[in-house]
A protein has these predicted regions:
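Hydrophobic, Leu/Ile/Phe/Ala-enriched alpha-helical segments that form helix-helix packing faces
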Residues: 41-45, 92-96, 135
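P-loop NTPase motor core
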Residues: 52-130
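Conserved, well-folded catalytic cores of nucleic-acid-processing
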Residues: 43, 61-64, 134, 138-141
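Conserved GTP-binding G-domain of TRAFAC-class P-loop NTPases and closely related GTPase folds
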Residues: 109-194
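Conserved P-loop
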Residues: 1-54, 60
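Short glycine/proline-enriched coil/turn segments at helix->beta-strand junctions
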Residues: 49, 97-99, 142-144
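Short, well-ordered beta-strand core segments
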Residues: 1, 102, 138-140
C-alpha cells in the first residue's frame, strides 16, 4: 500500500503502508519536489516483490502539486501535473511483470450532467485525457459496494464475464482474486515488507 496523503488505513490491518516521501534534499523547487515524488513511487512499484499494490488517494498527487505550486502564475504547472500523472499511469501499464497489479484508489466527482468521473485538476486531464480510459478495469464504489459496470451515472467498466453481478461487495482482495483468475495470473501470495 502506497499512501499519498495518510499514513494509516481507516481499518485494522497488517498491510504495510508506505507513505509517499515528501522530503528530497536535491529538490530546488516544488516542480522538482513533485517530480521526485512520482519517481519515488515508480521505484517502489518497480522494486516491490508484491504482486498487488494499492496507491491510496491517488488524486492527492494532483492536489498536493496544485497546492505546492499555487503561487506560480504560469499554466505550465497544470501541464506538469497532467504529464506527471499520465506518465505514472503509463509506467504502470508498461510494467514487465504481467502478474503485478497496481490499484489506484481515487475520488470521483459529479459532472454537470450528473454522471460520476475520476476527480482531476486542470483542463488537460479533464478534457484531453479520459483518465478512466487509461485503465482496463474501473470499479466505482458507493455505499460500501463496488459497481462493475456503468449505470449511466459512473464510468465503471470491467471485461464481460469478470464478475457475475453489476454490484459486488467492497472487498479489494476478492476483486484482486477475480482479476487474477480471469486473466490466468496466479495468486498474489508474495508478502513484502518495504
Amino acid at each position: 500500500m502506497i499512501s499519498v496523503e495518510k499514513g494509516r488505513l481507516p481499518f485494522k490491518s497488517d498491510i504495510k503502508v508506505c507513505k509517499v516521501k515528501r522530503d528530497f534534499p536535491n529538490a530546488k523547487n516544488y516542480a522538482d519536489l513533485n517530480a521526485a515524488c512520482y519517481s519515488w513511487i515508480q521505484r517502489v512499484i518497480a522494486s516491490s516483490k508484491a504482486k498487488s499494490i494499492v496507491i491510496d488517494d491517488s488524486q492527492y498527487l494532483l492536489v498536493n502539486e496544485l497546492f505546492d505550486r499555487a503561487k506560480e502564475k504560469s499554466y505550465d504547472k497544470f501541464t506538469d501535473m497532467a504529464v506527471n500523472f499520465r506518465n505514472l499511469i503509463h509506467f504502470i501499464n508498461d510494467l514487465p511483470e504481467e502478474d503485478k497489479i497496481v490499484y489506484f484508489l481515487h475520488h470521483s466527482e459529479a459532472t454537470s450532467d450528473g454522471r460520476e468521473k475520476a476527480k482531476t485538476i486542470g483542463r488537460m486531464l479533464d478534457e484531453k485525457l479520459t483518465l478512466e480510459g487509461c485503465f482496463d478495469i474501473v470499479i466505482y464504489c458507493t455505499d460500501h459496494k463496488f459497481y462493475t459496470q456503468a449505470n449511466n451515472q459512473s464510468t465503471a467498466k470491467t471485461p464481460e464475464g469478470l464478475f457475475e453481478s453489476v454490484e459486488i461487495p467492497n472487498d479489494l482482495k476478492a476483486v484482486d482474486d477475480a482479476i487474477r483468475e480471469y486473466y490466468g495470473l496466479g495468486g498474489a501470495n508474495v508478502e513484502e515488507k518495504t
